[in-house]
Amino acid sequence: MRGLITAALALIGLAFAAPQPTLWVQPDDGVEPLIQLIDTAESSIRLKIYLWTPSRMDVVEALGRAVKRGVEVRVLMEREPAGGRPSMEVISALRDRGVELRLSKPFRFVFVHEKSMVIDDRVAWFGSGNLTGSTFKANREYMLVTERPDWVREIARVFDADWHGQRIDLSHARLVWSPDRVVRGVREGNAREKVLGLIRGARKTLFLEQAGMVDEEVIAAIEEAVARGVDVRLVGSPADPKENTYFVPGAERLRKAGVRLRYLPSPYVHAKVIVADGNTALVGSINMSQSSMNANRELGAILTAADEPRAFFRLLRTMEADWKNARPDNPFLLPPVEGVIPWTEAPKYYGRVVTVEGRIAQVESRTGVAFLKFDTTPDAFRLVFFPRVYGEFDQPFPEAYLGKKVRATGRIKIYAGYYEMIINSPSQLEVLP
């Protein structure tokens, strides 16, 4: 009898359990699931985004279709992403399709860096990914999709407050929010508290996949974790530390403290994840920086292996695969590769200076850039030229190089998922007999 009662109570618990969130992984899953999600909207869409480029006009079109169905669509966009301006092409296209659009209020936050969407007050989408080409093609991103009512309500409630430029009390938030500060008695977020709590609470392991590592308090907390015997692993993308100080210097400092550090060349790590003791994870848009935790609008969620197993274990499997594929050395700090390599092997040497050889199969000239491609396939390795140097090369440029066998020397980089070498001088390019 007791067994039957226990089983019945278990079934009741399952019946009332919160719906399981789903984890979308980029670039694995692509943009189509997002388009399909938008196409389910019947009454309302709230979309908040940091960066939206013209390469994601497919999302614009999906929102336009929603408007035609009678859906109320509101978009709140950061007014100065990365210190620049939002795409006027995207803004015009949204407004032309009947989308109600507002830019973030000046001085309210440093950046509205949150990426989220609520559909019909029923389902929410949020995480690290912007609406760009690289998000769905070249970056490691994690996005959560949830029908959990308390999460959906909270994201919608914060959207409405930000839409009107109003403060909102998040002292009892279910999710993780920035900015973590108190203004005029209002607790606006909890991000720093949650990040440090996860790190300081770790007993055996910490596993981080991060785009940035610049916050002094976070770095110190990780160093303290290592000192108390916690095994800490950190994965990020390699970069020239002279050009990009957002990840490499902090990561290398942690390596010296005993952190096991690896660099993942591809996909580019734009993720912001902490996993503690193999059972609790923080996923979202929150970077390891003072601005992200204390001055931006950001959003994340805590997942546990016990409560959100489907999303949690997909996250962990992906991170373990990235760890396996990552390298211990930053290739930007390694010496040039000796000898000449075929162009097909260029991606193996991302971050390093190499000399490649091959025949130019396609040339392309766009506004502000020209390409010499070694193959006609879209993802073929390419040489990149900017207008200031066009006159220094064989004319007519770039057509003069079509069909020519060339040898090029430079550093292998990735842009929006394309492996490439930037050519700044004729000394880098030799035409062979």
Model-based region annotation:
Residues L14-S104, R108-E338, V353-V356:
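Charged, low-complexity intrinsically disordered terminal segments
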Residues L334-P433:
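OB-fold single-stranded nucleic acid-binding module
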Residues G3-L14:
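Sec-dependent N-terminal signal peptides
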